[in-house]
Amino acid sequence: MKFVDEVEIRVEAGDGGAGIVSFRREKYIPEGGPDGGDGGDGGSVYLQADENLNTLIDYQFERFHRADRGTNGRSRNCTGKKSDDLIIMVPVGTRIMDVDTQEGLGDLTQHGQKILVAKGGFHGLGNARFKSSTNRAPRQKTLGTEGEVRNLKLELLLLADVGLLGLPNAGKSTFIRSVSAAKPKVADYPFTTLIPNLGVVRPEANKSFVIADIPGLIEGASDGAGLGIQFLKHLERCRILLHIIDVMPVDGSNPVDNAFAIVNELHQYSPKLAEKPRWLVFNKIDLLPADEAKALCEKIAQELGETENIYSISAINKSNTQPLIHDVMTLLESMPKEKFVETTDEEVEFKWDTYHQKAAKKSDDDDDWDEWNEDDYDVEVVYER
């Protein structure tokens, strides 16, 4: 299935049903009075996270989603039926943003988590609501308010503990194959990896973490070179970054320059992402004698100004990968996930709330129902026995 991590959709909540004007008409009950019922509330639209989904491809072709309208009221004080809410299922890790206001509505980071994105319209009132001691035959009613309409941008951000960084052909996919059951494509040409891949690493029987492999970056990626930096967003929720460095690039380039290019692209994309713990992992040391490989790695680390969290491995034959995995697991256990979950106490203001508050205020300011007179509307009410 094609991996799609960004789509735009339009959601429309249902309008509220209208109230009606009706009067009770029964034998032996003269002047029965008003009995017009209220309408029903319109359906709201929710987004809910589902762990069984892993792509947003369905919403590339199904962009419009509308909840049903509430039904109108009926006579005998019968209230209209409230419409059912519309629930749209999305993958866990989906971020929701209003396209028009650029307002962040929330992140769905847990299975079953649900967020209201468009509130249904409020029901209209029937004429029974307007009866009073001075207005016994009211002919007023209100229509239901309109449901909220939003244009939403959905972004899928992978939920991983560890993210892999590096140039194309640095050995990221080979590394994730060697430490997990994931089987991303591996070949001897650049940009073999075109979409992010996830793998579950189990250092011990009851311990595990998720590692994410994204397409390689190149110098100028922030300006659109290569596949760009669009996939870096999948590392935003990672707690540790592993910077895979090829000590023997096939093009003869300098590993130090290559490493600085990746760090520069990281800073241009997000200074916050660049501040995450980043470990250097020198790969392909099997291409050199042990002494030469050790000396080269130390030289590169010195030029990069790194003195801690440096590892030398050979992903293809799994050499020195286990110590790295155990150290990663140890660090993750000391870094609770809750520390990295972005939370906000800011309440989302829905357009329906603003509309209804204004309508209620206007109704209070212009409240002249008690002064209503049938003669003002040239209506004659005749009651027959």
Curated annotation (Swiss-Prot):
InterPro entries: G_OBG (IPR031167), GTP-bd (IPR006073), GTP-bd_Obg/CgtA (IPR014100), GTP1-OBG_CS (IPR006074), GTP1_OBG_dom (IPR006169), GTP1_OBG_dom_sf (IPR036726), OBG_GTPase (IPR045086), P-loop_NTPase (IPR027417). Monomer. One of its GO terms (cellular component) is cytoplasm. GTP binds at residues 166-173, 191-195, 213-216, 283-286, 314-316. Residues 160-333 form the OBG-type G domain. Belongs to the TRAFAC class OBG-HflX-like GTPase superfamily. OBG GTPase family. One of its GO terms (molecular function) is GTPase activity. Its EC number is 3.6.5.-. An essential GTPase which binds GTP, GDP and possibly (p)ppGpp with moderate affinity, with high nucleotide exchange rates and a fairly low GTP hydrolysis rate. Plays a role in control of the cell cycle, stress response, ribosome biogenesis and in those bacteria that undergo differentiation, in morphogenesis control. Mg(2+) binds at residues 173, 193. Residues 1-159 form the Obg domain. One of its GO terms (biological process) is ribosome biogenesis. The gene is obg. Keywords: Cytoplasm, GTP-binding, Hydrolase, Magnesium, Metal-binding, Nucleotide-binding. Transmembrane segments: none annotated. It is found in: Cytoplasm. This is GTPase Obg. It comes from the Bacteria. Its cofactor is Mg(2+).
